Regions:
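Surface beta-strand/loop "capping" patches
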Residues: 166-176
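Substrate-binding/catalytic cleft of secreted carbohydrate-active enzymes
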Residues: 1-168
């Protein structure tokens, strides 16, 4: 999934339109992109929704709004185990939480994954899920001799490190 990154608020239409176009032109041929996400954490601008189809004319990938039932997908973040089961029992949309496990701050992205996976994978409405966050966010600091600054425990700690080295969460997830 390729996300029009933001935080709580969506971009205004002028800025959002420019960013959608740039993102799709940059990533349209990337083999791992199966969905476009118009925002994150509740922030999106519905006026930019049509631009995803306009710029992705060839593959016409789905565009989603995280945390929402939108475009035939239920992408709610961080559902509990039983919430997911209820969505299968009572729902009719494909369920694919755009964030459902948390590896940040090395909270063990694989902790509890087997329980979710064993139950959820038995239902045809389940299409998988996304773990936050893939890699450590550690900018290279030119003012500090080129060190990778992860701000101690205040920066996201992902499944892999800032140099893509495998961390504990990687092995826990891989074992699932």
């Amino acid at each position: 999934m390729d996300e029009l990154a933001g935080w709580q608020n969506g971009y205004d239409s002028k800025v959002g339109a420019k960013l959608v176009k740039e993102m799709i032109e940059r990533d349209v041929n990337h083999p791992c992109i199966i969905l476009w996400s118009n925002g994150n954490e509740g922030g999106w601008n519905t006026q930019t929704d049509p631009l995803f189809a306009q710029y992705d004319r060839l593959q016409k990938r789905h565009m989603v709004h995280p945390w929402a039932d939108f475009n035939d997908l239920d992408t709610h973040h961080y559902p509990t185990y039983l919430t997911g089961v209820a969505r299968f029992t009572n729902g009719y949309k494909v369920f694919m939480p755009t964030e459902f496990m948390h590896a940040m701050y090395d909270q063990g992205g694989g902790a509890g994954l087997r329980d979710f996976w064993d139950r959820w994978c038995t239902n045809p409405l389940f299409a998988g899920g996304f773990i936050w966050v893939y890699c450590d966010e550690a900018p290279k600091r030119s003012d500090k001799g080129g060190i990778l600054d992860s701000d101690k425990s205040n920066a996201p700690d992902g499944v892999v490190g800032p140099r893509r080295e495998k961390e504990g969460s990687y092995y826990a997830i891989r074992a699932q």
